Amino acid sequence: GYGNGREIRCESTSGRYTTCGYVDRRQHVEIRRQLSNQQCVYGRNWGVDGRQLWVDDGCRAIFVAY
């Protein structure tokens, strides 16, 4: 369920591309709480590349993988 997901904090500082840990390919990842003023949009400034969570262009958020 939603409550037992693993939280991953991922922050793009100075607009830089950043990777933040690994997720299982079967897991669903979504934003739990956005921390940046910049809107985080999936596929544009955050996503999962293979098994790595990434952010870019100032997106900062707490994600949850479950």
Model-predicted regions and their roles:
Residues 1-66:
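Glycine- and aromatic-enriched low-complexity segments, predominantly in secreted/extracellular proteins
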